[in-house]
Amino acid sequence: MIDKFKKYQAQTTKNPLGLEIIKAKGSYIFTKNKKYLDFVAGVSVNNIGHSNSKINNSIVKQLKEYSHVMVYGEFVQKPSVELCELLSALLPNKLNTTYLTNSGTEAIEAALKLAKRSTGRQKIISMKNSYHGSTHGSLSVSGFETRKRRYRPLLPNVHHINFNSVEDLNIIDNSVACVIVEPIQGGAGFIESKKEYLKKLRAKCNEMGVILIFDELQSGIGRTGKMFAFEHYNVTPDILVIGKALGGGFPIGAIICNQLLMNKFKSNPILGHIT
């Protein structure tokens, strides 16, 4: 199978691990002859283990009713409505409306578009050493030049500042559409925000009418001891981006904000964001 893998399926490194997985259960993955404790976890995805019976049973039950009918907010689908309701119940009152996507990087794209759409501004502030995804917009706001240099030109008007630098917040003015930040930087080695930093960032965004986006794709869904990392800081974003562990092993992402802000996607044009 490894020969067919190398012949027919694209790889992302010159020397892939090449483990032929035949089964996964709980915290373990299995090849024909070995059992491995899985510290990869689908890259921060399998938060409740492989082959979780509750997830599997839910999938089987849903497939007996229907699978795909419409991804946008047009048809009423009980599972997605109940998910959005649950997320609202877990979050502060201002984060009460959810747009579901197929992945985390799609959710980042949606958040950036919504910020530009709602403010009428183009400039975006992000952090050095940040990671937000690999599609065009999310790569543009990511802070690792080694990942970006082969794909330039990327989005214009993106400026990167030093993470946790209060002094650098002075670049935020009324020409900025949004600031996007990971409360805990994942790709940089799990670097935590300083509490005072996030509070001053929130205050600066309030002062300048700038949308504050928290990317909790890696830090969200219980990975820090609270459901969302921003809860440790008592600072609430305008837009929250989640994904990865939200699906427990299946592709999903979401942006969550207040309904007034989300309504910007309804008109001029209609279907203002299509995932």
Question: What is each model feature region?
Answer:
Residues 1-275:
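Conserved N-terminal phosphate-binding loop of PLP-dependent enzymes in the Aspartate aminotransferase
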